[in-house]
Amino acid sequence: MIKYNGSSCLELNDLWQALHSSFNSAQFRSIDKLILNECDSFSPMTWLKFSEEEFSCTIINCKDSSAPSPDKMSWGHLKHIIKDKSCLKNFVCIANACFDLGHWPNHFKESKTIIIPKPNKFSYDSLKSFRPIVLLNTLGKLIEKVIGERLQFQVISNNFTHQSQLGGLKFKSTTDTDIALTHFIRTGWVKNLLTSTLAFDIAQFFPSLNHHLLSLILDKAGFGPQVARFFLNYLINRKTSYYWNNFSLHSFDINVGMGQSSALSPILSALYLSLFFHIFEKHIKNLDLKISTLSFVDNGLLITQSKLFHLSNDRLFSSYNVVLTLLSKFGLQVEHSKTKVFHFSRVYSTFNPPP
């Protein structure tokens, strides 16, 4: 029996309401858009028309075995269709028209949300033990992939993303995160310093991205009014239908967040956090806290080095409070139960750091 807010979901309608409220809990969360004034706007970038080559190169990497979309079209179908150059040209025209008009068709805004259980959970009476998988229409997904590729390369060219961000971006991976952390630890040991870290997890990160703030961040990043206008329309009036086993319900409005199945989720979420890390860095410098950061999508790591445990703990505690304050201004929250502190020492005897 699924429980939500202490009450059992006895009727299907109770379940649907619980699902929607749980996976869209941030829709009424406040933001502080004035926080963006702490960073300067980046130089405007030119947005060129899409090309047939961009579409052809993108669809090659799409796996035919992907889950079927709401429009029943597979990647294999689409690959066959674009062999006809006139069809490919029409797809490119649709994508360019979307940016010219600042419009994303309602057909592409409709999705299916499949609820699946997370593996190896002790109990499945809570919605936290389940994961939403969002299925989008295939042609819309293709255009999103092309847009995502374009955004990735443009933010790399203007260095908008923060150097600590190692997830959701091209040419960066979990391996880079491991290498960077190992480098921190070993260079600290060479200097006879203890390396201490605080790991935190942003709760329901993708469903919590505020659409209005995201459009302002895109403008700050230098994408210009054409791109900002497109995303203002892209993000609104989205709808999803929930599916649980053999049951379904049509449909709910979605006014916050990004579906993790969207090709735009990695880059848009990275852009969303870029300004957070730039602003966090300024606050840390003003407080004279010797803190470094690493980030992989929705997981953050605060790093400090010293010879004294209490000094490291004080720095981590102070910087963690800065993280919580700034994230709240971005409409985000930390899942405190997952926050952990780790100390990396080269002491070979019994190692028992203070709490």
Regions found by a protein language model. Give the residues of each.
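Conserved polymerase palm-domain catalytic core
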Residues: 202-297, 305-313
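Catalytic palm active-site di-aspartate
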Residues: 69, 110-113, 131, 165-166, ...
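Conserved, non-catalytic sequence blocks in retroelement Pol enzymes and Pol-derived host proteins
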Residues: 44-50, 65-68, 79-84, 99-107, ...
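Conserved catalytic palm subdomain of right-hand nucleotidyl-transferase polymerases, strongest
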Residues: 64-74, 113, 125-135, 175-216
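Surface-exposed loop/turn segments and immediately adjacent short secondary-structure elements
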Residues: 1-126, 141-142, 161
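Conserved pre-motif C helix in the palm subdomain of viral-like polymerases
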Residues: 125-159, 176-180, 203-206, 254-285
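Short, conserved micro-motifs composed of acidic
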Residues: 246, 333-355
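Mobile genetic element proteins and their domesticated derivatives, centered on retroelements
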Residues: 19, 55, 69, 91, ...
